[in-house]
């Protein structure tokens, strides 16, 4: 019942917000931050408090200012996913769930423009043709999936190599990968275009600005952030940090909060109004402005059949 007054406020504010969106570039930074923080609270109220019991190997992580999931590679598989329609993550999750009943969750993916995705994407060992992708010549971060035919391995890393060259020549030059890779490991999936927060358990978030050339306006530096992190047990965390936390504060939380067990590496992907998490057909993290703006790419989570547990 507590949600209804908040939703009533949304109905009153939406005409003002969307009328003002035409001049958002000239909007006073303090006003923009205040509006964003208001909608952050509203989206939290809209997010479901009744997520069903989750399958083994998937746990909800929730601390003030951050929600997400912790994934155990023994029980789940993750896969980059793309779509070309102008629909959000919830609609795409619904479509996938009609085809594969094992789908459990999804989080928004890499940065995008009207032309396509701004990062490398590989799905099932191939370049998806549903969307265009543009990878920067500047070395950016990625989440990757390798397989030796029997076991899959999740990694975080950095490369400036295009998807086609990655499939042809592999990771060469100045690429980084946070876990050992053998000659038997084949690249199955990749979601790129991100920036560093933590590497080898150290805070390296300034590299995203100084070396990886990310340019966030000051007012957007503490907007929402979509974050992928790995711990010493090779578990993957898919997270959204709410407005108010910049990369420095996110790094501090990941390295200091007991809910995050010895994080070794963390990267960010597209954030702001794109940051969204869907779990079991409900929003664990609802869209910032209550309009699902996740587009083109995402990371989907599927439960494994019990016989597949390794």
Predicted features and spans:
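Bacterial N-terminal signal peptides that target proteins for export
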Residues: 1-8
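Bacterial N-terminal signal peptides
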Residues: 8-16
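Zymogen propeptides
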Residues: 20-161, 239
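Extracytoplasmic
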Residues: 64-66, 100-102, 192, 223-225, ...
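Conserved, well-ordered active-site substructure
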Residues: 116-137, 141, 212-268, 274-310
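Flexible, glycine-rich surface segments
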Residues: 173-240
């Amino acid at each position: 019942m507590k949600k209804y007054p908040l939703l009533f406020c949304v109905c009153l504010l939406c005409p003002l917000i969307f009328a003002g969106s035409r001049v958002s570039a000239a909007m006073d930074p303090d006003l923009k931050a205040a509006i964003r923080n208001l909608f952050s609270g509203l989206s939290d109220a809209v997010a479901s408090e009744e997520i069903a019991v989750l399958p083994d190997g998937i746990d909800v992580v929730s601390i003030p200012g951050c929600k997400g999931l912790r994934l155990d590679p023994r029980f789940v598989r993750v896969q980059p996913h793309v779509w070309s329609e102008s629909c959000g993550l919830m609609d795409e999750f619904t479509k996938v769930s009609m085809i594969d009943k094992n789908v459990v969750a999804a989080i928004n993916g890499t940065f995008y423009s009207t032309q396509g995705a701004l990062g490398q994407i590989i799905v099932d060992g191939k370049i998806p043709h549903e969307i265009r992708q543009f990878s920067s010549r500047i070395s950016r971060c990625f989440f990757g999936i390798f397989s030796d035919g029997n076991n899959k391995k999740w990694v975080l890393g950095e490369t400036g190599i295009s998807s086609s060259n990655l499939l042809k020549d592999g990771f060469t030059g100045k690429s980084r990968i946070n876990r050992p890779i053998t000659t038997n490991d084949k690249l199955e999936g990749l979601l790129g275009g991100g920036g560093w927060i933590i590497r080898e358990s150290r805070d390296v978030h300034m590299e995203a600005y100084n070396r990886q050339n990310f340019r966030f306006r000051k007012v957007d530096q503490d907007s929402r952030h979509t974050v992928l992190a790995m711990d010493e047990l090779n578990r993957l965390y898919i997270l959204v940090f709410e407005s108010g936390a910049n990369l420095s504060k996110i790094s501090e939380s990941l390295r200091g909060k007991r809910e995050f067990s010895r994080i070794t590496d963390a990267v960010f992907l597209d954030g702001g109004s794109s940051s969204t998490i869907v779990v079991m057909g409900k929003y664990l993290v609802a869209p910032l402005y209550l309009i699902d703006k996740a587009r083109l790419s995402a990371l989907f989570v599927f439960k494994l059949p019990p016989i597949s547990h390794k």
